[in-house]
Amino acid sequence: MTNNSTPNVLFIMADQMKASILQLYSSEIGIETPSLERLAGEGVRFEHAITPHPLCVPARTSVMTGRYPHSTGCRRNETLMPENEQHAFRIWKENGFTTGLIGKNHCFIESSDLKLFDVRCEISH
């Protein structure tokens, strides 16, 4: 992107981690995460977020599409992102952002979706 007013977007979604263990969220356990704390201080921190689904793939799909699992058909971990579904990474890529996917995916399997990522380093369970 050449426009200096265009923000950098770093989206971090942890799997099976409660915010209540982090010092960042005033936890009694208080696990220190200095890098996350610095990022949160400079960006957006969600204070009242609730997962749309207890399973990881439907929850990720909901966050990426802005739709509930029942509306995308992704209600189980075995049911992945529908082909040609509109989602955040598609929108970012279409608007000139450089995109990357690092870590656990389990959402995007269609080649049309995977091509949206300039950098991809996936891990599994």
Predicted regions: what they are:
Residues 1-125:
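Formylglycine-dependent sulfatase
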